[in-house]
Amino acid sequence: MNFRFPFLLMITISLIGAVLTFGNDVRPRNQYGNEIFCPHQGFNQKCNAICKRKKYLLGFCDQKTCLCKVRP
């Protein structure tokens, strides 16, 4: 009985840590804490998140191909 409680506690803490770590992976946040999206994109899409993760900060998100393009 004494062994089960710390074991379950460690598992629970690890799961919470994993959710908090990877929860921002799809929708990254800027330095002000706001979620980053493409201007013409809905809240459930990942295209702009991929663009921001690849550091195309001066680029834009192509809606058809979901690719990041750099502005000329």
UniProtKB/Swiss-Prot annotation:
List, alphabetically, the SUPFAM superfamilies matched.
Scorpion toxin-like
Tissues with expression: Expressed by the venom gland.
- Which terms are listed as keywords in the entry? Disulfide bond, Ion channel impairing toxin, Neurotoxin, Secreted, Signal, Toxin, Voltage-gated sodium channel impairing toxin
* Gene Ontology molecular function, alphabetical: sodium channel regulator activity; toxin activity
Q: Where does the source fall among the domains of life?
A: Eukaryota
Positions of disulphide bridges: 38-61, 47-66, 51-68
User: Which InterPro entries would you find in this protein's record?
Assistant: Scorpion_toxin-like_sf
Q: Where in the cell is it found?
A: Secreted
Q: Which GO terms describe its cellular component?
A: extracellular region
Q: Look up the signal peptide feature and give its range.
A: 1-21
- Protein task: Binds to sodium channels (Nav) and affects the channel activation process.
What protein family is recorded?
Belongs to the long (3 C-C) scorpion toxin superfamily.
Annotated protein name in UniProt: Putative sodium channel toxin Ts18
* Species lineage: Eukaryota, Metazoa, Ecdysozoa, Arthropoda, Chelicerata
